[in-house]
Amino acid sequence: EGMKPELVREYTALIKRIMEVSRKYQYGRTLELRQCFPFEYSKMPAVILKPAMVKEELYICEDFSKDKVITVSSYEEIGNYIKEGKADAGIGIIEEVGIGVSDELHNLLAEKDLYITQCKVQEDGGVRRKVVTFTDKLVVLPSHNRVKVMFECPNHSGSISSILSMISDYGVNLTEIHSRPFWKDNSWNYKFFVEMNANIDTKEIRALIYQLSQETAYLKILGSYACEGDF
């Protein structure tokens, strides 16, 4: 009482910051003591013999003989083929760097429980494309330096800034982020798709992902993979 409004704001911000740092420590200790990491993953590389692709994107295929690739008409079909065992992986363009991302492929990963396991950057006519391979199992290898996640965040002041601050507290850099609004419970909310420069199979990143799972409305891992460069 009697404090200047600007001092109240600064004091409140300081208290919030202390609480955030305290929660970070508590989540890390909880994970150590209870072994309660909420996601399972394999440490064995995926064996891919029957990849599937959208026919119009077959030209980007570099790692497989094109006559061995199953071609379909949509990403949804690729997802169905993987789930039915007709294909063991999908390949597609998830982003044209500096131009835009594929909403269809992001939706497929989020809704069909599919995971990026490889990422290559191709250049063609001055356009850089992120070409990803995805399977129905989350695989984490020591060489991986990227983690892609999707989380839901309510549309109120400070919600995303607190999440980004949390990620920063772990010393993690973001290499890509985009959002998409959706209608839920009579209000607009947001799905955020985030790529982080990190490896899941480390103590700090497991603690970060555990904290994200507790402090967002919903969290899903979309992949673990290696990607060269700053994109």
Predicted regions and their residues:
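Domain-level signature for soluble enzymes in the chorismate/prephenate branch of the shikimate pathway
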Residues: 1-231
